[in-house]
Structure formats: C-alpha cells, structure tokens
Regions:
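Basic, alpha-helical nucleic-acid-binding regions used in initiation and control of genome expression
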Residues: 2-115
Length: 115
C-alpha cells in the first residue's frame, strides 16, 4: 500500500490533479454528484464547527458548486495554485472508489523521478 504521508509534495500535487480529473470526468456525466459534494460540505461543517479555516474553505466550495458543472470541472482539472489549494479539501471525497484512489497514488509514488 502507498502511504500519502510518505509522498513528496510534488507527488501529492500530481495525485490531487489526477484525482480531480477523474472526478471531473464522472461529474460531466453525473451532475447529481454536486448534491453529493454539498452533502459532504454540510456534514463536514457540522463536524468542524470550531475550525474557522476549514469553514472558510467549505464556504468557498459552496459558492463554486453553485456554478455550472463545466466550470466546476475546469477547476478540478486546473493546474493552478488556487485549484491545488481547493483540491486539498475537495467535497468530492467518496466519489472515487478507494481502489481507484490507491491505484493513482501507487502510480505516482512509483513513477520515475523527472527533472
């Protein structure tokens, strides 16, 4: 098994981007996943009521999720610092099967280093 804690920051960013792309691919065909993401945000907001930084992130995602699906998908696939920051707390957790997530992590963890 691949442990995310042992991954380099650049590997974590690559994994996050690939997972975002895979979620976006599903979201284009299953726009109802926006409701799933909103439910995650509602639950997380209740669970993390004493964490203002997380609540700000969740509020930002709520605004994003009110946009058209294509715009949400563009953000999930963007290689920008802002998109990377947002993907760190993606409300789409649970959309991808654990085996798929681990396969992506494993692929990047064991990929040859590029300079």
């Amino acid at each position: 098994m691949v442990n995310s804690a042992n991954m380099k920051h650049s590997e974590t960013d690559q994994v996050s981007l690939e997972l975002g792309r895979r979620v976006a691919e599903r979201l284009r065909w299953q726009p109802e996943l926006v409701a799933f993401a909103l439910a995650n945000l509602a639950r997380w907001s209740r669970q993390n009521i004493a964490a203002p930084s997380l609540l700000r992130c969740y509020a930002e995602w709520q605004i994003i999720l009110s946009r058209p699906v294509d715009e949400i998908c563009d953000l999930l696939c963007a290689a920008t610092e802002d998109a990377q920051r947002l993907r760190q707390n993606s409300p789409f957790a649970g959309v991808l099967a654990p085996a798929e997530v681990w396969a992506v992590k494993s692929r990047f963890r064991h990929a040859p280093a590029t300079a």
